[in-house]
């Protein structure tokens, strides 16, 4: 396995570990989630380039679209929670239920 794949997998695992450790604040969870999506995007792009299959180029673009949607929803929740409560704790997400 080339060293670049191991580095990207290590970046994904570090982001996953950060997501598990720093799960009390929404901002740190969003940053770890973005790190995971970035490493998945780079890995899928490298795989698509190595496969030389024309339809494989759609996968990184679709992943990038989902990452952008996830970031928009996450930032909207962050702004909503911080405007309402002044804090970005994840346990405040339960208070947004009707």
Swiss-Prot record:
> Origin, by domain of life?
Eukaryota
What species is given as this protein's source?
Trachypithecus poliocephalus (White-headed langur)
What EC designation does it have?
A: 7.1.1.2
Where, subcellularly, is it found?
Mitochondrion inner membrane
Disulfide bridge partners, by residue number: none
Tell me how this protein assembles: Core subunit of respiratory chain NADH dehydrogenase (Complex I) which is composed of 45 different subunits.
Keywords assigned by UniProt, alphabetized: Electron transport, Membrane, Mitochondrion, Mitochondrion inner membrane, NAD, Respiratory chain, Translocase, Transmembrane, Transmembrane helix, Transport, Ubiquinone
GO CC terms on record?
mitochondrial inner membrane; respiratory chain complex I
Q: Which family does it belong to?
A: Belongs to the complex I subunit 4L family.
Which purpose does this protein serve, as stated in its record?
Answer: Core subunit of the mitochondrial membrane respiratory chain NADH dehydrogenase (Complex I) which catalyzes electron transfer from NADH through the respiratory chain, using ubiquinone as an electron acceptor. Part of the enzyme membrane arm which is embedded in the lipid bilayer and involved in proton translocation.
* Catalytic reaction annotation: a ubiquinone + NADH + 5 H(+)(in) = a ubiquinol + NAD(+) + 4 H(+)(out)
Bilayer topology annotation? Multi-pass membrane protein
Q: What residues form the membrane-spanning segments?
A: 1-21, 29-49, 58-78
| Protein's name in the database | NADH-ubiquinone oxidoreductase chain 4L
Q: What class of enzyme is it?
A: translocase
InterPro entries named among the record's database cross-references: NADH_UbQ_OxRdtase_chain4L/K, NUOK/Mnh_C1-like
Task: Give the Gene Ontology MF terms in alphabetical order.
Answer: NADH dehydrogenase (ubiquinone) activity
UniProt record, GO biological process: ATP synthesis coupled electron transport
What would be the name of the gene that encodes this protein? MT-ND4L
Q: Name one Pfam family in it.
A: Oxidored_q2
């Amino acid at each position: 396995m080339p060293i670049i794949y191991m580095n990207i997998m290590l970046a994904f695992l570090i982001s996953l570990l950060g997501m598990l450790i720093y799960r009390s604040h929404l901002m740190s969870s969003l940053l770890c989630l973005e790190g995971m999506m970035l490493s998945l995007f780079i890995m899928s792009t490298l795989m698509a380039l190595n496969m030389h299959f024309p339809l494989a180029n759609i996968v990184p673009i679709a992943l990038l679209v989902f990452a952008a949607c996830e970031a928009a929803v996450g930032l909207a929740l962050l702004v909503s929670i911080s405007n309402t409560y002044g804090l970005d704790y994840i346990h405040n997400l339960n208070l947004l239920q009707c």
